[in-house]
Each structure stands twice: as structure tokens, then as C-alpha cells.
Amino acid sequence: MGLKARRAAGAAGGGGGEGGGGGGGAANPAGGDSAVAGDEERKVGLAPGDVEQVTLALGTGADKDGTLLLEGGGREEGQRRTPQGIGLLAKTPLSRPVKRNNAKYRRIQTLIYDALERPRGWALLYHALVFLIVLGCLILAVLTTFKEYETVSGDWLLLLETFAIFIFGAEFALRIWAAGCCCRYKGWRGRLKFARKPLCMLDIFVLIASVPVVAVGNQGNVLATSLRSLRFLQILRMLRMDRRGGTWKLLGSAICAHSKELITAWYIGFLTLILSSFLVYLVEKDVPEMDAQGEEMKEEFETYADALWWGLITLATIGYGDKTPKTWEGRLIAATFSLIGVSFFALPAGILGSGLALKVQEQHRQKHFEKRRKPAAELIQAAWRYYATNPNRLDLVATWRFYESVVSFPFFRKEQLEAAASQKLGLLDRVRLSNPRGSNTKGKLFTPLNVDAIEESPSKEPKPVGLNNKERFRTAFRMKAYAFWQSSEDAGTGDPMTEDRGYGNDFLIEDMIPTLKAAIRAVRILQFRLYKKKFKETLRPYDVKDVIEQYSAGHLDMLSRIKYLQTRIDMIFTPGPPSTPKHKKSQKGSAFTYPSQQSPRNEPYVARAATSETEDQSMMGKFVKVERQVHDMGKKLDFLVDMHMQHMERLQVHVTEYYPTKGASSPAEGEKKEDNRYSDLKTIICNYSESGPPDPPYSFHQVPIDRVGPYGFFAHDPVKLTRGGPSSTKAQANLPSSGSTYAERPTVLPILTLLDSCVSYHSQTELQGPYSDHISPRQRRSITRDSDTPLSLMSVNHEELERSPSGFSISQDRDDYVFGPSGGSSWMREKRYLAEGETDTDTDPFTPSGSMPMSSTGDGISDSIWTPSNKPT
């Protein structure tokens, strides 16, 4: 019962200490752990004095060297307990069972497989011995064919074959077993797959054939004699010497690499053979062979097959001499084709020889390159561990777990360890002498760590631990649970011996983790630089050919980079294809025309659906596009600012000179003064861009202000209105209806104000008072100048002007200036805003898409408002 409770207490304390670097275990060190310890002391039957002696003996060492405290059963329990430890990142305990036997089994299996299938080093000696055995069997089998050596060689051959059968049988069994180290040959299905390999089938066949030969021995019966011929099957054992087929692979690669050359040589040689054989057959088929007595014998070239035999022997430079041409014609043909055919028959031998030489050289170079694999793998591993040991990367845990299992961590100096060990042994001896249950008490105090060892050998004495113990690092981590428990006990008892010896209880493993990690980090940096240096040494060129190849590769890479850079530069600075159609010719006869594709309402940078050509996507094309946009914006801003300044100037003039005064003597005097001060009249220059007679390109007319509607439209013909037209009431009644239209619309010059000076009126009856219903010439002159100012608004409506980027709002409200004693609506109230009828570019070339307002298109204006011209309507 006490043992189970101690396990639970140790597990609770260890879990709290190991979880977050002492956070859980140190939360209540004097409360929970002390209470649990007191309960366990009562359960195991310890007296208070015994506990104090044990604490006095073991308290000072718990937080300094845990390996000495655990050595009581550490050797035995290390083989059986599940290894648990806390990682360098203070994670939860990890359970990683070490399968030493399994690893050893796999290592031996891999070693045997490599020795039999991929021999290197000492394994080549075994294969050389097998080759000598096979060669000896073959030599003895040849000697048995001699009568004088048949008996002796037969006896030795029987012994050697028996030995070879055992050797080859054991080797075959080892091959089948060792093949399990490969993933594709694991299990009985994988072993069957391995046994179906060609060389394994050859071994099985030779073993089966050798067993009956050895069984019958040297008997003289017919069965034994017939079975002895199977001994020559041992020649097939020579094939098994090259288990990996390197020879055949080399020959096959040479033939495949020069297959076209070989086919060409064999093809031309075959054509030469059949042609020469046929011609010699035609010439020599009717020539009989003469013997020594002069008698005729059968012809040497009786058939075409005889001629082919002669051609093959001759062109292959063998020359048996059994068949030769007898006539001079045949000899001439044979000599001619021999000079041609021999060269082509000998050509494949040279091709194969050069191909094999090149392949051998390539294999040597490949072996040289294979030497880079290990340094490259070491460099990659060192680079990863150098990266994984970055203290800022808290998510990389696997590398720290690796060091947890391989790093030996000596906590103290050697002299401190020896002194502490000797002093602890003395104290433990005194405790054991005073209390025979001391050893059991120690074991039960450390039950969470050494349960199995305490149960089997409770009276084992602790032994000092050397600094090379592989379990020291992991064991020290497991001591944290006891360290927290011991710190709580020391806090309650106030052990003076701890203070005298100068060891603090707060010296835990967490204090050493940053130092250990920094040391590991430094080692990783050094190893990374070392492996990098080794890898650079292996990059040295193999021969001059490698140097030339490296220079050639570098030159090609440099050329490709230069070409790429040149392409990018050309793309940036070379103008691409034009993004817009060709400019249209400017229209003749118009006072002012805009460049094509640059209408104020249709900006040049706005993409059009009708444009088929793609825009230039180069950097220079984009620069040009932005420059055009900025230029167009500048022109629009200049236009708007100029128009605004002109408008404000005229407003200031009107405010200054038309403000009503109370001291006006009479209408006649006022008109006289105004005539003296103002002599300029507003003129509107209209030009019809439509086709027609160019006699009057411009027409001048004057418009009185009382004939102007709210939006600047005239009720009657301007010429008639200036010469004593009807009253304003009658003029308002004659305003144009919405249904009236006009045939032609003028094109007004942009930003053009022409003031016609020195204009006088001959009829004094037209002059009226300044406050009468009829407008005086001075008022007409000023009002006409402001109401019908020939400012081209560049086809910009009110909304566009209000959104103008210049910041000037043309349609901004201003103070109403009243010109008249009645205080009613005056012309200034009606003309505060620029009328849409005053916009200019409503001609066909610049008419925007979509419906336009009637005031802009002129659909609601009659033809009588424009000056009559000679143009046909």
C-alpha cells in the first residue's frame, strides 16, 4: 500500500516539476508535497527521527547530483524500466523504448546483405574464395576427361563439389534471410520475390544439378556416367561472380550509346558482303576446279551460299583459303570489294572499343562524384541542426530530443563529485547502522524512480557514478520531482548542513538548460563550418575535362544572364507598337480643331472598345502614357483657371459700375455718362464648321439683355432685337418652344474674348433709362459682354466643372446683385450660373456618346436666334 502511494506521490510531484520548468511542482512546495510526504512516512512506519536522519543524509545531494542518489538500483532497473525524460524544451515526459536487440538484428542483417550483394572491402575476399572454388571444380572436371588423370581428379572433384554444395547452400540461405533488410523484400512474399531473381534461380538450378552428381560419386554404371556430364553446368557458376551484372550493364550501355554508328557500319558491311558475293558467284559459277592430274572437279562456287561463305571469311580477314576465285575477273572483284568491305567490318570493333573506354572513364568520374555524397549529406544535416537549434524557434523539438538521448551532461567538477559521493556514503552508512530500515527507507523514498530495482535488491549499496555515464543527462531530468519534494522538506526543517556546505536547493535542471542549449548551439556552428569546408574540398575538378566543362557551363550561364538582362532593358526602354490608331488629318475650314484622339470629353488615355491594337506594355510606353495624361490634365487646369479668372474679372466690373445709386439725376444724363465711360460692345464670333460657302466665315451680332432667357437663349433674331424690338413682355411670350430645332450649330473658339471698341449707335431713340424696361446701350454692352462671353467650356457641363481638379468651382453661389429699384429678379440672378447652351464643342467630331441635354444639343432653339448666313439649311 505504501509503495503504491509513493508511486502516486512521485508521479504527481514529477509531473508538476517536469511540465513547465518547475511551474506546476513549485506552486505549493511546502503544502502539498509535505503533506503527502508526512502521510507516506506514517504509512511505511517510519519514525520522525529516522526521517530526519534520512533527510540529513540525502537532502543536500538531491538538488546537486541526482545520479548518485539513483545509483542504488540504477544498473539493474536501467535495463527494464521504460526510459522517460524531459526534453530540453521542458515538455512532458517522453516514452521511447530502446529496442537494442532489434537494432542489432537489423544491423547484422544489413551487413550480411551488403557483403553478399554489394561487396566492398573485406567482402571481396569471400567472393574471391568462391571464385577459386568454382575455377578448381572446372579444372578438375576437365582433367577427368584424360585417361591417366581420370581416377585422381575424380576423387578430388568429389570432395570439392561436396564442399561447394555446403558453401553455396549456406550462402543462398543467408541471401534469402538478409534480403529482409530491404523494404521490398520483407516478409515471406518479399523473400519469394527475391528468390525469383535470375541469379537466384541460377543458384537453385546449379545446387539441384550438383546434388545427384555428388550422390552417385565415382561409380562406373551408366547412370553415374551420364550424370557426370552435369558437372560442366558448374560453368554457369562463373556467371554468379558478377551478381550485380556490372559487366553486362557496361557493355549494354556502350552499345546503346553508339547504336546508330554500329547500325550504320553493320548495314554498309552487309551490303558490301551480299554484292561482292553475288558478283563473284556470277563470274565463278561455271569455272570447274582442276585437280593435280588435270581432271575436272566440281565448281568451288557451285551455289550462292558458297559465295556468301567466301565473302564472309574474306571480309572478316579470316581467310581459310578453302575457296578462292580462279578467274582474273573474279579476283579483281574480290580485291575491290575487300578494300571497301574490310574497313566497314572492322569499324564496329573500333566503335565498341572507344565506347567502352568512354564508359569506363565516365564510371571513374561517377565514383569521384559519389565521394561527394557523404560530405553533402553531412553538410545538409549540419545545416539543418544549425537551423533547428535556433533558440528563437520554439516549434523545433525533434533535434533537442535527439540530443536528449546522446548527450552526457556532467553537472559538476570532478573534485566536487568525488567529495560529495564520499560524504554521502559516510552518511548513508551511519543511517544504516542506526536504523536497519535505512536502505529500505531510501528505496521507498525513491520508489517513483527505482521501483523495480528496490523490489529485487533492496539492500544494494549505492556506488559512485563516473562522468561518462550515458544515463546521467536523462537521470538528472528525472530527479526534478524529488528535487521539489526535497526542497519543501528542507524549507520545513531548516537543515543547517545545507547552508554550511554552500549548496542551494534552487539549483535545478532549468538553470542549466539555457547553458546547455548555448553549448549545443556553438557546437552546431562549428560542425556546420567544418562540414562546409570538407564539402568544398570535394568540389575540386576531377581532371582537365572537368575544368573545361565548368568554364563552359559558367560561360553559357553568363551569356544567358546577359541576354536576359538585354531583353529586359529592351522591354523597358524600347518603344513598343503604337497603342492608338494613326492621327487623323485636321479638318479644313474650322477656326480651331483639337488633335485627334484628344477631345476634351474623350481623353486619350481612356480605353476604347473600337481600338483593335493593343497598348504598349513596355516601361517606356507606360511613361509616355503617364506623360500624356499629365499634359492633358495641365491643359484642362489652365483652361479652367483662365475661364474662372475672366469670369471673376467681369463680375467685379459689373459690381463696381452697375451698383444702383440714389442720386441719379435723369435717365438721359446717366446714359450719357455711361456712353462716355463704356464704348466696347460684346461680340460673339460664330463659325459654321459645316460645308457651305465661305463668304461670311464670321458673323457679328449684338444681343440686348432683355431678349435673353434664363439660360441665355434669344427669343427673336438678334439683328431685329437690337433695333427697337418689342417689349420684354412680348419677348417673353415669343420664347422658343421645346419642339423647335435648328439645322446647324456653331463651333465657338475656346478662351477667346474679343471686344469690339468704338461702336456707336446712330438712333438715339434706342437709348433708354438705366431703370426702364428697355435696356440702354451701355447696359446692353456690359450685359452682353458678361452673358454671352465667348468662352469655350470645352464641352464641360456643370457636374464636370464642379468636379474640376483645379479647385475652382465655376458654379459657386455668389451674392446677388440687384440692379433696379424694384429689387426684383435681375439679369445677374439669372446669370449666376453658366448656361449649358454656352458650351461649345457640340459639333460632330467631338459629340460624346449617349444622349445629350436639349440645351446642349440645341434641339429646343429655333433657327432665328443665330445670325443668318448664306449657308444652306
Curated annotation (Swiss-Prot):
Name the GO terms of the biological process aspect: action potential; action potential initiation; apoptosome assembly; cellular response to ammonium ion; cellular response to calcium ion; cellular response to xenobiotic stimulus; endocytosis; establishment of localization in cell
- Residues annotated as region Disordered? 1-41, 575-603, 723-742, 766-873
**Placement of sequence motif Selectivity filter:** 317-322
PTM summary from the entry reads: KCNQ2/KCNQ3 are ubiquitinated by NEDD4L. Ubiquitination leads to protein degradation. Degradation induced by NEDD4L is inhibited by USP36.
Listed A to Z, the keywords are: Cell membrane, Ion channel, Ion transport, Membrane, Phosphoprotein, Potassium, Potassium channel, Potassium transport, Transmembrane, Transmembrane helix, Transport, Ubl conjugation, Voltage-gated channel
| Intramembrane residue stretches from the record | 304-316
- SUPFAM superfamilies the record matches: Voltage-gated potassium channels (SSF81324)
Expression by tissue, per the entry, reads: Expressed in brain and sympathetic ganglia. In brain, expressed in cortex, hippocampus and at much lower levels in cerebellum. In sympathetic ganglia, expressed at approximately equal levels in both superior cervical ganglia and prevertebral ganglia.
User: Topology: which residues are Cytoplasmic?
Assistant: 1-121, 177-194, 246-257, 355-873
Binding locations of a 1,2-diacyl-sn-glycero-3-phospho-(1D-myo-inositol-4,5-bisphosphate): 244, 260, 367
Q: Where is the composition biased (Polar residues)?
A: 588-601, 725-741, 844-873
Indicate the family of this protein. Belongs to the potassium channel family. KQT (TC 1.A.1.15) subfamily. Kv7.3/KCNQ3 sub-subfamily.
- Entry protein name: Potassium voltage-gated channel subfamily KQT member 3
